[in-house]
Amino acid sequence: MTDIRKSHPLAKIINESFIDLPAPSNISAWWNFGSLLGVCLIIQILTGLFLAMHYTSDTMTAFSSVTHICRDVNYGWIIRYMHANGASMFFICLFMHAGRGVYYGSYTFTETWNIGILLMFTVMATAFMGYVLPWGQMSFWGATVITNLLSAIPYIGTNLVEWIWGGFSVDKATLTRLFAFHFILPFIISALAAVHLLFLHETGSNNPSGMMSDSDKIPFHPYYTIKDILGILLLILVLMLLVLFSPDLLGDPDNYIPANPLNTPPHIKPEWYFLFAYAILRSIPNKLGGVLALVLSILILAIIPFLHTSKQRSMMFRPLSQCLFWLLVADLLTLTWIGGQPVEHPFITIGQLASILYFSIFLILMPVSGIIENRLLKW
C-alpha cells in the first residue's frame, strides 16, 4: 500500500515540497534564508492579526490605540515589538537571500528570480504602510514624503497623489486605506511565495558550485529540515533578544510623538531597511530622476540575468567578481549610513559617489569582470 503522504492530494504537495524533495548535497547555510523568510512571514501575520484586534485606523485614536496595546492589553507590548522588530528580521533575511542569489548565480532561474523581485517590492510596500499606522510624527511625515514622490510622474502625478491620499493631504482616508492594504498584502505575499516555490521546484535548487547536481541529490527531510530548524531557533533567539532587551533600537524616537501636520521633524527618514534606496533618491537633485533611481535601485536586479557574461554560474571560483560583490555590500552599507544623515556636506557628495558606484557595479563592472575571468581561463 502506498504511503498516505504520497497518495493523499494535499499531503502529496507537502511531501514533494518539504519531505521527499531532492536537494543538492552541498548547499550551505546561505540556503537557510528562504525558510527563515517563511517563518518571518508567519510571525508577522500572527502578531499582526492580534494587533489588528486592538488597533483603530482613525487619525484621532490610532496613536492612543497603539499606546493602549502596549499598556493595557495582555502581553500587548511583546506582540507589538515582535511585529515591529520582526519586520527588521524579515528584511535582514530578505537582503541575505537576495545577496546569496547574486553571489551564487541563482538569478539564472529567471521565473523564480523575477517573482522574488516582485515579492521584494510587495514586502517593501507592506512595511512602508505598516510604518504609517502608529500615526506618530515619522509615520505621518514619512507617508507625506513618500506618497508625494508620485507627483513627479508627468501629467497624472498630482491627480494620482490626491487619489491615493483620498483628499488634499495625508489624513483619515489615507490611514484607513493604508491599514486595509497593510492587512491584505501579507496574504498576497504568501500566495506569491507559493508561486516562487512552485517555479523553484520546477528547476531544483542551485548550489554553491553553480554546477548541475542531479547526480548528487539527498532528500530534504531529515537533512535540511533539521538544518532549517537550527536556523529558525537562531532567528527566534536574535528576534527575542532584540524585543526583550532593546525593542526601540531600530525605531525612531520621533514616532513616540503623535502626528502633527503643523510641525515638521528636523530629519525625515524611513526605517533602516529603506535607507539605502532613500540615499539613492536624495543623491539626484531632480525629483523625477530621483524617483526613477529609487525604483531602479531594486528593479536593476531584474536585468542581472541579461548581464551575466561569465561562463561560470557561481562566483565561488571567480575572485574578481567576488571582490566586486563585497564592494557592492560595502557600498550598500555606506548608502544605508548616508540615508540616515542630514542633507549637508560631505554627506551629499558621499551619497552621490556611492549611488554612482552602486549602478556601475551592476551595469559595467560585473559584466566586464565576467569577460576578464573568461579570458584568464582561456575560454
Curated annotation (Swiss-Prot):
The lineage of its organism: Eukaryota, Metazoa, Chordata, Craniata, Vertebrata. GO terms for biological process: mitochondrial electron transport, ubiquinol to cytochrome c. GO terms for cellular component: mitochondrial inner membrane; respiratory chain complex III. Belongs to the cytochrome b family. GO terms for molecular function: metal ion binding; ubiquinol-cytochrome-c reductase activity. A ubiquinone binds at H201. Heme b b566 binds at H97, H196. Pfam families: Cytochrom_B_C (PF00032), Cytochrome_B (PF00033). It is a multi-pass membrane protein. Its cofactor is heme b. The chain crosses the membrane at residues 33-53, 77-98, 113-133, 178-198, 226-246, 288-308, 320-340, 347-367. Keywords: Electron transport, Heme, Iron, Membrane, Metal-binding, Mitochondrion, Mitochondrion inner membrane, Respiratory chain, Transmembrane, Transmembrane helix, Transport, Ubiquinone. Its main location: mitochondrion. This is Cytochrome b. Heme 1 (or BL or b562) is low-potential and absorbs at about 562 nm, and heme 2 (or BH or b566) is high-potential and absorbs at about 566 nm.
